[in-house]
Regions:
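Alpha-solenoid repeat scaffolds
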Residues: 32, 76, 80, 101-102, ...
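Residues that mark the junctions of alpha-helical repeat units in TPR/alpha-solenoid scaffolds
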Residues: 1-2, 77, 84, 110, ...
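Amphipathic alpha-helical repeat scaffolds of TPR domains
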Residues: 1-7, 34-56, 71, 82-102, ...
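Eukaryotic acidic, Ser/Thr-rich intrinsically disordered low-complexity regions
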Residues: 117-150
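Non-membrane alpha-helical segments in proteins
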Residues: 1-12, 21-25
């Protein structure tokens, strides 16, 4: 029953409860319900990333849940490379958002932010070469050259 309630918390958008309960389930070694073919870490990472991508595309905030789960993805959870790469890509793209929620390096005027975004995107590419960040990284490099002329 606990597993079903945990999934339900995500379904109704109660991410505070869902994440907390999923972390408890992970700590206790509990399995996901039989209709979910992933472990808890993959389920939470997939669910929160899908939600964050939709929110960001509409220009809405994704915190605190994005960072909370991203910390787990980077440190505690062993996820497949493809999903981990998607998280790093999303982290980079979030730093580049314009007023409409689109990743646009030309909208960023701070070199440190651009460099951090490029760092996350490079990590994504290192984990999964087909994650699709090459063009964005080239645009970041161009923007950095504009901001830091020699």
């Amino acid at each position: 029953m606990f597993q079903l309630l945990t999934v339900w918390a995500f379904d109704v958008g109660d991410f505070d409860t869902g994440i907390a309960w999923a972390e408890l389930a992970i700590a206790q070694g509990q399995h996901t319900p039989s209709n979910i073919k992933r472990d808890w870490a993959h389920f939470v990472a997939d669910t929160v990333l899908e939600w964050a991508e939709k929110q960001a595309a509409e220009g809405h905030a994704v915190e605190p849940w994005f960072s909370q789960v991203f910390d787990k993805v980077r440190g505690d959870w062993r996820l497949n490379e493809r999903l981990t790469a998607k998280w790093f890509k999303a982290a980079g793209c979030l730093l580049l958002r314009d007023q409409d929620g689109q990743p646009r390096p030309s909208a960023v005027g701070d070199s440190a932010t651009l460099e951090q975004a490029d760092h996350w995107l490079a990590q994504a590419e290192k984990l999964h070469s087909k994650v699709g960040v090459n063009t964005l990284r080239q645009k970041i490099a161009m923007r950095l050259r504009v901001l830091n002329p020699e």
